Amino acid sequence: AYRIAMNFGSQAQNPFLMTLDGIKKINLHTDGLGQGVLLKGYGSEGHDSGHLNYADIGKRIGGVEDFKTLIEKAKKYGAHLGIHVNASETYPESKYFNEKILRKNPDGSYSYGWNWLDQGINIDTAYDLAHGRLARWEDLKKKLGEGLDFIYVDVWGNGQSGDNGAWATHVLAKEINKQGWRFAIEWGHGGEYDSTFQHWAADLTYGGYTNKGINSAITRFIRNHQKDSWVGDYRSY
């Protein structure tokens, strides 16, 4: 069972040790049912802040020490932890925010992304690939060590950062897999070859039916045991 522990807007609603407490409670109430917990807003000031600085562990929610404690103690309760990141946008507070990586429209204006807090600006993912993206994953691994299970890459696949096609996605997934982490993604159709979990496929009531997942019976027959990528049996479809 997947669920989310979210921090947002500098409010620290779910500090790392509170998330651990929740894991213990759910383990008790479900008689040891396994858990997949996505930490949404693990860094900077919470969700959708500080993007591209993956190793910036949120201080308000416990910092690196508490995060490592969560990772270590969650194992006892059958919980697999992942983090929610973005490889398509950046924000002014990130130390990796710079003019060269920002994507522009044909008229020279910036290509803007999400804007519910600071205004996000889309990046040029090809430039990012060639200028330090892998090193940022490695920095995160150095801080956390072993034990993190997966990386969920938000919005990748919609093209807002340029080429999000098959080759670019394979490279991104390999960078993540190299650190010992599974690769997960948002769209039901996104990263089918590499991703083991797609949000829109698994969240039955979220989004429209055209993005709900992979409906190939042949592909599912071959790979059903490897991933959660398939269109759900949900009557509204």
What is each PLM-predicted segment?
Residues 92, 96-135, 181-237:
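Glycan-recognition surfaces
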Residues 160-161, 192:
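Conserved protein kinase catalytic core
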Residues 2-159:
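Aromatic-lined carbohydrate-binding/catalytic grooves of carbohydrate-active enzymes
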Residues 165-171:
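Charged helix-capping and loop-helix junction motifs
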